């Protein structure tokens, strides 16, 4: 039997992929950005109708988005962006490159990537940790930074003894915005996004703390992250996991990538 080593071949600037990257990054062009007070937090982007709102309208027109798909509802606390990409067109590549681009343009260095299933989680992890992928973004795309991926896993069952703050969350939070060559990414599957007694992200009785935080959800909230959601049709706004992201993590921005998006009912119609 022959052993064959195969490397993923990536092509830079495929038109549909570049369009997806620019569509997100351009949303924040010429908007007010406040420098973070704490070393573990993202810069704070001002979400105004005159800034972000006008940019979104211009991007939709530029990309000839159909009027029925151009809804924009202003929310000053959290911006929600939906990026439609057909299956097999490189969503993982696009959202990974988008993180690099947002870091390059605006200094955003804390991202949480939420996926619906373990196979998708494994695929995303393999892609972002791959040496060839890292070299591609550095040497071909010219990004002067590297992703440090922290993957959240369920805790091993312990009958007795001290419980420790989740290591992936701790390392993610401790990542400093002063290190301009690092982009910190926390990868989670939706089953871990729960609020329940003694559950890993919502409990506050750990034997250690991270930057003064006893509760992992509170620590994540303090980083003011951007959240990326893959496969939103499996991760609808009506599900508890999405509510946990909104209420417990309270990100500045939620970016959903998918081929289909679940409909939500409003009054007698659907949105």
Which positions does each model-derived feature cover?
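Conserved Walker A/P-loop ATP-binding site and its immediately adjacent core
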Residues: 92-94, 107-154, 189-194
């Amino acid at each position: 039997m022959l052993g064959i080593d195969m490397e993923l071949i990536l092509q830079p600037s495929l038109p549909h992929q570049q369009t997806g990257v620019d569509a997100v990054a351009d949303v924040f062009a010429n908007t007010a950005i406040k420098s973070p007070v704490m070393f573990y937090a993202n810069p704070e982007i001002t979400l105004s109708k005159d800034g972000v709102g006008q940019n979104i309208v211009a991007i939709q027109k530029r990309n000839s988005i159909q009027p029925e798909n151009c809804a924009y509802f202003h929310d000053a606390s959290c911006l929600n962006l939906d990026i439609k990409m057909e299956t097999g067109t490189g969503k993982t590549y696009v959202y990974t490159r988008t993180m690099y681009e947002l870091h390059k343009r605006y200094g955003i260095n804390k991202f949480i990537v939420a996926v619906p299933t373990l196979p998708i989680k494994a695929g995303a992890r393999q892609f972002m940790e791959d040496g060839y992928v890292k070299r591609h973004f550095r040497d071909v795309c010219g990004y002067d930074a590297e992703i440090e991926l922290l993957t959240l896993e369920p805790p091993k069952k312990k009958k007795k003894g001290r419980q420790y703050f989740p290591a992936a969350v701790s390392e993610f939070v401790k990542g400093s915005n002063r290190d301009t060559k690092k982009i910190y990414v926390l990868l989670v599957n939706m089953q871990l996004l729960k609020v329940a007694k003694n559950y890993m992200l919502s409990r506050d009785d750990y034997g250690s703390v991270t930057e003064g935080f006893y509760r992992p959800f509170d620590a994540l909230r303090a980083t003011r992250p951007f959240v990326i959601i893959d496969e939103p049709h499996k991760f609808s706004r009506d599900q508890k996991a999405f509510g946990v992201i909104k209420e417990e993590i309270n990100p500045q921005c939620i970016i959903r990538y998918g081929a289909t998006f679940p409909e939500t009912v409003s009054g007698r119609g659907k949105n």
